[in-house]
């Protein structure tokens, strides 16, 4: 009885691993806090640019969430700390017809995230992971974490959040990966979502 009531924790097609594997499209860009800027742009009333001290002054949160990469590994219970995405949405007054957030990163990576997933209470811009300052290869100084989607949407080395009413596909989305990427629906690829095409993301 108890067993049948257990909530399934691992999304379909995934396997547990102990540590997240570092996945990067290129070399890890250096994190220089003195010239760090976070830009919030697009369809907003008040576009802003924040330096590192302004980022640090924002309200903070922490979450513990599983992390699912589309290449089929999942890591249990990573603790992320940082700024809730909702704070940033309020700060710039995002227009009501915004549907997507295009995230741009210092390594040239980008990803587009549906606004409902981006705005969830467990989504954040993290500067700490499992109790320590984010390691360079995990996205320092600041990475997006959207735990309800595959990990390719959790962009590292974030520089800009552009709020859009019309979708603009990011790096992996231009290469056939799913617009949304919900691991529970196995939204891996746009065509043939559960396909066996070799996963790069
Ligand atoms: N800027 C940037 N962010 C990125 C990537 C990348 O190549 N560049 N790779 C993505 C992919 S495919 C995954 S699985 C996760 C991996 O996070 P990790 O390297 O911290 O384990 O980062 C995502 N964010
Ligand atoms: Mo990934």
Spans of features found by a protein language model:
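Structured, non-membrane catalytic/scaffold regions adjacent to prosthetic-group chemistry
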Residues: 2-201
